[in-house]
Amino acid sequence: MNILLTNDDGIEAEGINTLAELLSKYHNVTMVAPENQRSASSHSITIYEPIIVKQVKKPYNIEAYSISGTPADCVRVALDKLVPDNIDMVISGINKGLNIGNDILYSGTVSAAIEGAMYKVPSMAVSAQFIKNKKENYKIAAKYALGMLNRLKKEDLKNDVVLNLNIPFCSEEEIKGIKVCKVGNKIFNTRFSEEIDEEGNKVLKLEGDINKDIYEGTDVYYIRNKYVTLTPLHYDLTNFNILEETEQLFLS
């Protein structure tokens, strides 16, 4: 397959390069990624500034470009200008940290994959759980991403599909299997610490703790039980459950 590879951690991040090295052994890979760290960019795009594109050399045989924009910008620029007619699938990742539960709304990694689907290209986001002071398990995540890709044939790929793949932090032997499941609830209970700087301004720092309320059958539940999770996503935000009710409420 011809694969467009992107991320939100930046073009020099270990995750994307681990995945690129493995995928390039079996597929044609073009890497288009942010020049700097752009985590939690969500689906933001660059409007008021020019986007700078630079070709980057990689030690494996792929074309690579850095973009002075967001993850969504990378996909837009790639599919409009750099490789407009030659991509079978967009893969975003490997992200440093999970993208499960409500966190997918903030994720530049997932949003880049969704942008691919908006261009009618099947897409997959890949994320690996990160635990502070421990070595990331990118090689395991890359192996699972390749395994998912190898199960697909071009004719199997629907152009509006977005697959969200997450790999828990554990040894490959400890992984219990793969679960196709729904998105869970929030992972963290958010709060801000507050300080006062020398000029009397409030300085807020994001903190929080792990949300212990877990719904069974969700990606959050299965990741915590050492399963790889795969969730099909879509970008239609319409709440169909109350569409008719809303019409009756406001138009009747």
Swiss-Prot record:
Membrane-crossing residue ranges in chain numbering: none
The enzyme's E.C. designation: 3.1.3.5
Kindly list the GO CC terms recorded for this protein.
Answer: cytoplasm
Superkingdom field: Bacteria
Cofactor descriptive note: Binds 1 divalent metal cation per subunit.
The protein's annotated catalytic reaction(s) are:
a ribonucleoside 5'-phosphate + H2O = a ribonucleoside + phosphate
Which residues are recorded as binding a divalent metal cation?
D8, D9, S39, N95
Requisite cofactors: a divalent metal cation
Query: Where is it localised?
Result: Cytoplasm
Q: Which Gene3D superfamilies match?
A: Survival protein SurE-like phosphatase/nucleotidase
Q: Which Pfam families match?
A: SurE
Assigned keywords, A-Z: Cytoplasm, Hydrolase, Metal-binding, Nucleotide-binding
Tell me, in one coarse class, where this protein mainly resides.
Answer: cytoplasm
The GO terms describing molecular function are: 3'-nucleotidase activity; 5'-nucleotidase activity; exopolyphosphatase activity; metal ion binding; nucleotide binding
Family membership noted in the UniProt record: Belongs to the SurE nucleotidase family.
Q: Return the HAMAP family for the record.
A: SurE
Q: What does this protein do?
A: Nucleotidase that shows phosphatase activity on nucleoside 5'-monophosphates.
Entry protein name: 5'-nucleotidase SurE
Q: What's the encoding gene here?
A: surE
